[in-house]
Amino acid sequence: MAEFGRNKKSNGKKFTKEYKVKAIQQNITRKARLKKEYLKALKEEGYAVPEKETSRREVNVKKLKEDKRLEGKKKIDEKKELKKQRKREQREKLEERRRKEEEKVKIIRQKEQEREQKRRKMTKRTRSGQPLMAPKIEDLLSKIKNDDTYTL
Protein backbone atom coordinates (compact mmCIF):
# COMPACT_ATOMS: atom_id res chain seq x y z
CA MET A 1 0.00 0.00 0.00
CA ALA A 2 1.01 3.55 -0.56
CA GLU A 3 2.15 5.75 2.30
CA PHE A 4 0.13 8.78 1.12
CA GLY A 5 2.85 11.39 1.25
CA ARG A 6 4.37 10.27 4.51
CA ASN A 7 8.11 10.24 4.73
CA LYS A 8 9.44 6.86 5.80
CA LYS A 9 12.25 8.54 7.73
CA SER A 10 9.96 10.47 10.13
CA ASN A 11 7.72 7.44 10.59
CA GLY A 12 5.23 9.43 12.70
CA LYS A 13 7.83 10.70 15.15
CA LYS A 14 6.54 14.27 14.79
CA PHE A 15 3.93 13.54 17.40
CA THR A 16 6.22 12.18 20.09
CA LYS A 17 7.22 14.18 23.12
CA GLU A 18 10.94 13.79 22.41
CA TYR A 19 10.50 15.23 18.92
CA LYS A 20 8.58 18.24 20.25
CA VAL A 21 11.15 18.91 22.98
CA LYS A 22 13.97 18.72 20.44
CA ALA A 23 12.11 21.06 18.06
CA ILE A 24 11.53 23.61 20.83
CA GLN A 25 15.19 23.48 21.86
CA GLN A 26 16.30 23.97 18.26
CA ASN A 27 13.92 26.91 17.90
CA ILE A 28 15.26 28.53 21.09
CA THR A 29 18.90 28.10 20.05
CA ARG A 30 18.13 29.48 16.56
CA LYS A 31 16.45 32.57 18.03
CA ALA A 32 19.34 33.12 20.46
CA ARG A 33 21.87 32.81 17.62
CA LEU A 34 19.93 35.27 15.44
CA LYS A 35 19.68 37.77 18.30
CA LYS A 36 23.40 37.47 18.99
CA GLU A 37 24.24 38.02 15.32
CA TYR A 38 21.88 41.03 15.16
CA LEU A 39 23.44 42.67 18.23
CA LYS A 40 26.93 42.01 16.84
CA ALA A 41 25.97 43.62 13.52
CA LEU A 42 24.56 46.67 15.35
CA LYS A 43 27.78 47.02 17.31
CA GLU A 44 29.93 46.77 14.15
CA GLU A 45 27.88 49.47 12.40
CA GLY A 46 28.24 51.80 15.37
CA TYR A 47 24.71 51.80 16.66
CA ALA A 48 23.98 51.70 20.38
CA VAL A 49 23.40 48.19 21.55
CA PRO A 50 20.40 48.01 23.89
CA GLU A 51 21.39 46.80 27.32
CA LYS A 52 19.73 43.89 28.95
CA GLU A 53 17.23 45.14 31.42
CA THR A 54 15.40 43.02 33.87
CA SER A 55 11.82 43.66 33.14
CA ARG A 56 9.30 44.36 35.84
CA ARG A 57 7.59 41.17 34.90
CA GLU A 58 10.73 39.14 35.59
CA VAL A 59 11.21 40.92 38.91
CA ASN A 60 7.57 40.32 39.79
CA VAL A 61 7.85 36.67 38.80
CA LYS A 62 10.96 36.27 40.95
CA LYS A 63 9.25 38.04 43.83
CA LEU A 64 6.14 35.88 43.46
CA LYS A 65 8.26 32.72 43.36
CA GLU A 66 10.13 33.82 46.48
CA ASP A 67 6.86 34.70 48.22
CA LYS A 68 5.37 31.33 47.29
CA ARG A 69 8.47 29.55 48.50
CA LEU A 70 8.41 31.44 51.80
CA GLU A 71 4.68 30.86 52.15
CA GLY A 72 5.12 27.15 51.49
CA LYS A 73 7.97 27.00 53.99
CA LYS A 74 5.84 28.85 56.52
CA LYS A 75 2.99 26.36 56.06
CA ILE A 76 5.38 23.45 56.41
CA ASP A 77 6.86 24.99 59.56
CA GLU A 78 3.36 25.52 60.99
CA LYS A 79 2.45 21.91 60.23
CA LYS A 80 5.66 20.71 61.87
CA GLU A 81 4.96 22.89 64.91
CA LEU A 82 1.41 21.52 65.18
CA LYS A 83 2.75 17.99 64.89
CA LYS A 84 5.34 18.65 67.60
CA GLN A 85 2.69 20.20 69.84
CA ARG A 86 0.38 17.19 69.39
CA LYS A 87 3.22 14.80 70.17
CA ARG A 88 4.14 16.86 73.24
CA GLU A 89 0.51 16.84 74.43
CA GLN A 90 0.25 13.09 73.88
CA ARG A 91 3.50 12.55 75.77
CA GLU A 92 2.28 14.75 78.65
CA LYS A 93 -1.05 12.88 78.79
CA LEU A 94 0.76 9.57 78.78
CA GLU A 95 3.14 10.71 81.53
CA GLU A 96 0.20 12.03 83.59
CA ARG A 97 -1.68 8.75 83.18
CA ARG A 98 1.43 6.77 84.09
CA ARG A 99 2.06 8.95 87.14
CA LYS A 100 -1.55 8.51 88.32
CA GLU A 101 -1.30 4.75 87.87
CA GLU A 102 1.95 4.64 89.84
CA GLU A 103 0.37 6.75 92.57
CA LYS A 104 -2.65 4.41 92.75
CA VAL A 105 -0.37 1.38 92.94
CA LYS A 106 1.70 3.07 95.65
CA ILE A 107 -1.42 3.89 97.71
CA ILE A 108 -2.74 0.33 97.32
CA ARG A 109 0.59 -1.17 98.43
CA GLN A 110 0.75 1.19 101.40
CA LYS A 111 -2.79 0.22 102.48
CA GLU A 112 -1.93 -3.46 102.12
CA GLN A 113 1.16 -2.99 104.32
CA GLU A 114 -0.90 -1.16 106.95
CA ARG A 115 -3.51 -3.95 106.94
CA GLU A 116 -0.78 -6.57 107.26
CA GLN A 117 0.82 -4.73 110.20
CA LYS A 118 -2.57 -4.31 111.87
CA ARG A 119 -3.38 -7.99 111.33
CA ARG A 120 -0.05 -9.04 112.85
CA LYS A 121 -0.62 -6.76 115.82
CA MET A 122 -4.13 -8.07 116.39
CA THR A 123 -3.13 -11.73 116.13
CA LYS A 124 -0.26 -11.56 118.64
CA ARG A 125 -0.49 -14.10 121.41
CA THR A 126 1.12 -14.77 124.75
CA ARG A 127 3.43 -17.70 125.41
CA SER A 128 0.53 -19.75 126.61
CA GLY A 129 -1.43 -19.02 123.41
CA GLN A 130 -3.86 -16.43 124.76
CA PRO A 131 -4.56 -13.36 122.52
CA LEU A 132 -3.05 -10.06 123.64
CA MET A 133 -5.73 -7.52 124.52
CA ALA A 134 -3.57 -4.35 124.47
CA PRO A 135 -3.42 -4.05 120.63
CA LYS A 136 -7.16 -4.67 120.38
CA ILE A 137 -7.94 -2.01 122.99
CA GLU A 138 -5.57 0.46 121.27
CA ASP A 139 -7.34 -0.20 117.97
CA LEU A 140 -10.76 0.44 119.51
CA LEU A 141 -9.46 3.62 121.19
CA SER A 142 -8.00 4.93 117.90
CA LYS A 143 -11.31 4.20 116.14
CA ILE A 144 -13.20 6.18 118.79
CA LYS A 145 -10.74 9.08 118.52
CA ASN A 146 -11.05 9.16 114.72
CA ASP A 147 -14.86 8.96 114.78
CA ASP A 148 -16.59 12.37 114.60
CA THR A 149 -19.64 11.34 116.65
CA TYR A 150 -17.59 11.03 119.86
CA THR A 151 -15.64 14.28 119.53
CA LEU A 152 -17.01 17.58 120.73
UniProtKB/Swiss-Prot annotation:
Organism lineage string: Eukaryota, Fungi, Dikarya, Ascomycota, Saccharomycotina
Protein name: rRNA-processing protein FYV7
Pfam families: rRNA_processing
Protein species of origin: Candida glabrata (strain ATCC 2001 / BCRC 20586 / JCM 3761 / NBRC 0622 / NRRL Y-65 / CBS 138) (Yeast)
GO BP field: maturation of SSU-rRNA from tricistronic rRNA transcript (SSU-rRNA, 5.8S rRNA, LSU-rRNA)
Basic residues bias spans: 118-127
Entry similarity comment: Belongs to the FYV7 family.
InterPro entries hit by this protein: Fyv7/TAP26, Fyv7_fungi
Function: Involved in the processing of the 20S pre-rRNA.
Region (Disordered), start-end ranges: 66-152
Main subcellular location: nucleus
Cell compartments where the protein resides: Nucleus, Nucleolus
Coiled coil: 71-122
A single cellular component GO annotation: small-subunit processome
Biased composition (Basic and acidic residues): 66-81, 89-117, 136-152
Keywords: Coiled coil, Nucleus, rRNA processing
